[in-house]
Amino acid sequence: TEIKETKMNRNIKFFCSGIAVFLFAIFTFSCKGKATNNNAGDSDTVAVAKPIGPKFNPDSAFAYTEAQCNFGPRTMNSSAHDKCEQWIIAKFKQYGCEVQTQKADLKAYDGTVLKSTNIIARTNPKAQQRVLVCAHWDSRPWADNDPDSTNHKKPVMAANDGASGVAVMIELARQIQADSVPNVGIDFVCFDAEDWGVPQWETQYQDQSGDSWALGSNYFAKNLPLA
C-alpha cells in the first residue's frame, strides 16, 4: 500500500513536527541555569532552560508511518496486526531500547476475544527520572464515521490515528540513541486494543460504548509492568 503525498500526509508531518516541540520540554524540564539582571544592585535571578537533546526528523517519522500502513489495517487478531507487532518491536530494539510485551486476552463489547499486545520500550532503564510517552498501534476495524456509508464496515488504515503516534516514538528512540540524555529515561508504550469501541451502526450494544474503548491502556493501568 503506497501512501501518496496528500493533504492527510502533510497533516501527519505537521503533527510530527508538533510532537517535536512537545519533546523539547522532555529534554529541558530538568535542566536549569541562572540569568542575572544587568542592573547593579539587583540580585534577583531567574531559572532558564538550557536547550539540549536531539533534533526531531519528521521525514523519518513519516517513513515509519508509511511502513506500518504497508502491512495494511492492523486490526485485532489479523495477520497484518501480528506482522506489525514484530516490526515495532524490532525497530525499538534497533534503536537501543529495552523492550517487553504485555499480552492479554481482552473481551470486546460483543464477546470477541482480542489477542492484545502492549509494547513497552524503555531507554536508559536505570534512570530514576522517567517520562512516559504513549500511543496506540491497532487499527479500527470499521470506518463508521466515514461520510460514505458504504465504507462503514470496512477497516481503517489508521495512518494518522494509530501509526503516526508510534512513528513519532520510534523516531524519538532513534534520536535518543544518537544523542542520549543520561539523567532521563523514556518509557514508550504502544497500546493495543484501543480502537475496538462499539461502532455507530451497531444498535445492540450502545449501552456499553463507554467501556468498549481503550482496552489495552486500561489493562496496562491495572497491571503495571514497569518497576
Where are these regions (language model features)?
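Bacterial N-terminal signal peptides that target proteins for export
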Residues: 8-19
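C-terminal motif of bacterial Sec signal peptides marking the signal peptidase cleavage site
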Residues: 27-30
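Extracytoplasmic/secreted proteins, especially bacterial periplasmic and envelope-associated proteins
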Residues: 60-67, 79, 83, 87-94, ...
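A non-catalytic alpha/beta surface segment that caps or lines the substrate-entry region
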Residues: 66, 73-126
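Acidic/histidine-rich catalytic neighborhood of metal-dependent amide-processing enzymes
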Residues: 153-227
